[in-house]
Curated annotation (Swiss-Prot):
The gene is RHOB. Prenylation specifies the subcellular location of RHOB. The farnesylated form is localized to the plasma membrane while the geranylgeranylated form is localized to the endosome. This is Rho-related GTP-binding protein RhoB. A motif (Effector region) lies at residues 34-42. The lineage of its organism: Eukaryota, Metazoa, Chordata, Craniata, Vertebrata. Keywords: ADP-ribosylation, Angiogenesis, Apoptosis, Cell adhesion, Cell membrane, Developmental protein, Differentiation, Endosome, Glycoprotein, GTP-binding, Lipoprotein, Membrane, Methylation, Nucleotide-binding, Nucleus, Palmitate, Phosphoprotein, Prenylation, Protein transport, Transport, Tumor suppressor. It comes from Homo sapiens (Human).
Length: 196
């Protein structure tokens, strides 16, 4: 029996952990060196609720320099992972400011999973000290949940690519969301060529 194919696109600020999340899930290895992504694709097989699914994983660049290139990733998307980092309250602020408007524009009826990356850094003393200097603190679970409600996300999950905690759950949840029937006049992402 042929696998069902679904397309997953990951968005979020630069350095918020998108690429590490994808690499840990698809290759089971944690990259120790940060190299900003321009555009990467991975494929991973996952079984959810007895269904074999081939997930096309589309990594995107979070930096503003790529704001005009990123929409090329959106056509035919089945689910969005919208990421922020627990050690960067600013990356959570950018969810409603930047990422939701962009995704809702190009993918109006695609389910969004809000993902808190780098969960392991929430209790890291060095991170807490650095954030305290700027009168900030790591993002709390309640803040993430509240944001998920605010943006009407399909679900909210937390994970750590470094410890692998929660990684599989993120992709299982995303796959379930991608498999659900969509409602609304527009199925999936609009073809960005029409809007550019």
């Amino acid at each position: 029996m042929a696998a069902i194919r679904k397309k997953l696109v990951v968005v979020g600020d630069g350095a918020c952990g998108k690429t590490c999340l994808l690499i840990v899930f698809s290759k089971d290895e944690f990259p120790e060196v940060y190299v900003p992504t321009v555009f990467e694709n991975y494929v991973a097989d996952i079984e959810v609720d007895g269904k074999q699914v081939e997930l096309a994983l589309w990594d995107t660049a979070g930096q503003e320099d790529y704001d005009r290139l990123r929409p090329l990733s959106y056509p035919d998307t089945d689910v969005i992972l919208m990421c922020f980092s627990v050690d960067s309250p600013d990356s959570l602020e950018n969810i409603p400011e930047k990422w939701v408007p962009e995704v809702k524009h190009f993918c109006p009826n695609v389910p969004i999973i809000l993902v808190a990356n780098k969960k392991d850094l929430r209790s890291d003393e060095h991170v807490r000290t650095e954030l305290a200097r700027m009168k900030q603190e790591p993002v709390r679970t309640d803040d993430g949940r509240a944001m998920a409600v605010r943006i009407q996300a399909y679900d909210y999950l937390e994970c750590s690519a470094k410890t692998k905690e929660g990684v599989r759950e993120v992709f299982e949840t995303a796959t379930r969301a991608a498999l659900q029937k969509r409602y609304g006049s527009q199925n999936g992402c609009i073809n960005c060529c029409k809007v550019l």
